[in-house]
C-alpha cells in the first residue's frame, strides 16, 4: 500500500470508515490473518486485521480500561486472570495495574501479532510483557479453555469479530470451556461488537452463554474507531449480585486499587450496564 493513500475498513458492505495512511509500518500475512500497522495523524498508530480496525493509539484506552477494570473491580478479589487474544498487550497492561492479581495468563493464537505489536505498538503493552506474573501461551483459545488444568477468577475474551480466526471464540464450545475453568463466583467478559449494527452477534452470545451462566447481560462503552454506535461487552457469571454492587462498594475498591484512569471511573462502571431499549426488546423476544 502506498503512503498518503486512504485505507478503507471492510467490516460492513453498505458503509464504512477510512483512514489516511501517512506511513505504513508493517503489512504482511501472518500464519492466520492479514495484518497492517500504519500511522495516521489523527489516531496515531493503527492496527487492522483482515481489513478491520483492531486498535489505535489514540482511543485504545477506552476499550482496554472497560474490559479489565469493570470485571476486576466487580469481582473484588481476583487472583488469577485469563486473557484470550490481546496480542497487542494493552489488556495485559491494564490487568497488571491490579496489584492483588497473582497470575495473568494470555492465550494468543497468532505469535506474529505479539511480535509485531511489541515492535510497532510499544505504548500498548508499556513493558507489561516483562511482568513476572505474566505467562504467554500460543494456542487456540477454544483448545486452551477445554484442556487447561488451571482455573481463573476473571476471563477476558479480547477476540476479533466472529469471522476468520475469531469465529471460534463465539461458539458454545468456547463458552463451555470458559465455564469449565472459571472459579466459583468468577466473571467472563468478551467484546461483542457494536450492538446497533451487530445485534445478532449479541443475541447469539446471550443465548449461548445462558446455557452455562445464571447471570448473562451486557455493558457498553463509546469507542470512536469501533464506529456505528456503542460497543457492547458480554458479561456472564453465576454470582448474580456483582452486577448490582453499590456505587459505594465500587468507589471503595477503585480507590483501594490506586487506579488513575482516562475513561473508567465508578460512575461509568454503574452507567455502563444501562442498555438501550431496542436491545432489551430483542433479548426479551428471543
Curated annotation (Swiss-Prot):
Annotated metabolic or biological route of this protein: Amine and polyamine biosynthesis; spermidine biosynthesis; spermidine from putrescine: step 1/1
EC number(s) on file: 2.5.1.16
Source organism superkingdom: Bacteria
EC class: transferase
Positions of the PABS domain: 5-238
A matching Pfam family: Spermine_synth
Compartment annotation: Cytoplasm
Keyword Metal-binding: no
Alphabetized GO MF terms: spermidine synthase activity
Catalytic activity, reaction form: S-adenosyl 3-(methylsulfanyl)propylamine + putrescine = S-methyl-5'-thioadenosine + spermidine + H(+)
Any GO CC annotation of this UniProt entry: cytosol
GO terms of biological process kind: spermidine biosynthetic process
PROSITE patterns xref list: PABS_1 (PS01330), PABS_2 (PS51006)
Record carries keyword Magnesium: no
Residues the entry annotates as binding spermidine: 64, 88, 158-161
Coiled-coil segments: none
Active site residues of this protein: 158 (proton acceptor)
Binding site for S-methyl-5'-thioadenosine: 33, 108, 140-141, 165
Keyword terms: Cytoplasm, Polyamine biosynthesis, Spermidine biosynthesis, Transferase
Family in the record: Belongs to the spermidine/spermine synthase family.
UniProt subunit comment: Homodimer or homotetramer.
Entry function: Catalyzes the irreversible transfer of a propylamine group from the amino donor S-adenosylmethioninamine (decarboxy-AdoMet) to putrescine (1,4-diaminobutane) to yield spermidine.
Designated name of the protein: Polyamine aminopropyltransferase
Organism of this sequence: Salmonella arizonae (strain ATCC BAA-731 / CDC346-86 / RSK2980)
Gene label: speE
Amino acid at each position: 500500500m502506498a503512503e498518503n493513500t486512504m485505507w478503507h475498513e471492510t467490516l460492513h458492505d453498505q458503509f464504512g470508515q477510512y483512514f489516511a495512511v501517512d506511513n505504513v509500518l508493517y503489512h504482511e500475512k501472518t500464519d492466520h490473518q492479514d495484518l497492517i500497522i500504519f500511522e495516521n495523524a489523527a489516531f496515531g498508530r493503527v492496527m487492522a486485521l483482515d481489513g478491520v480496525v483492531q486498535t489505535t493509539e489514540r482511543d485504545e484506552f477506552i476499550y482496554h480500561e472497560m474490559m479489565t477494570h469493570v470485571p476486576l473491580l466487580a469481582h473484588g478479589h481476583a487472583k488469577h486472570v485469563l486473557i484470550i487474544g490481546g496480542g497487542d498487550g494493552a489488556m495485559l497492561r491494564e490487568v497488571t495495574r491490579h496489584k492483588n492479581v497473582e497470575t495473568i495468563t494470555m492465550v494468543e493464537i497468532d505469535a506474529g501479532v505479539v511480535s509485531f505489536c511489541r515492535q510497532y505498538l510499544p505504548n500498548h503493552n508499556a513493558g507489561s510483557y516483562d511482568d513476572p506474573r505474566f505467562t504467554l501461551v500460543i494456542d487456540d483459545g477454544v483448545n486452551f479453555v477445554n484442556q487447561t488444568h488451571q482455573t481463573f477468577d476473571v476471563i477476558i475474551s479480547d477476540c476479533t469479530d466472529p469471522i476468520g480466526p475469531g469465529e471460534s471464540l463465539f461458539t458454545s464450545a468456547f463458552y463451555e470451556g470458559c465455564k469449565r475453568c472459571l472459579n466459583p463466583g468468577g466473571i467472563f467478559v468478551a467484546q461483542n461488537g457494536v450492538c446497533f449494527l451487530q445485534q445478532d452477534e449479541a443475541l447469539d452470545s446471550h443465548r449461548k452463554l445462558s446455557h452455562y451462566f445464571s447471570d448473562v447481560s451486557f455493558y457498553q462503552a463509546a469507542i470512536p474507531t469501533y464506529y456505528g454506535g456503542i460497543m457492547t461487552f458480554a458479561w456472564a457469571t453465576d454470582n448474580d449480585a456483582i452486577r448490582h454492587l453499590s456505587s459505594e462498594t465500587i468507589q471503595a475498591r477503585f480507590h483501594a486499587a490506586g487506579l488513575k484512569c482516562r475513561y473508567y471511573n465508578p460512575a461509568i462502571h454503574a452507567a455502563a450496564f444501562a442498555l438501550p431499549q431496542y436491545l432489551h426488546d430483542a433479548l426479551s423476544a428471543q
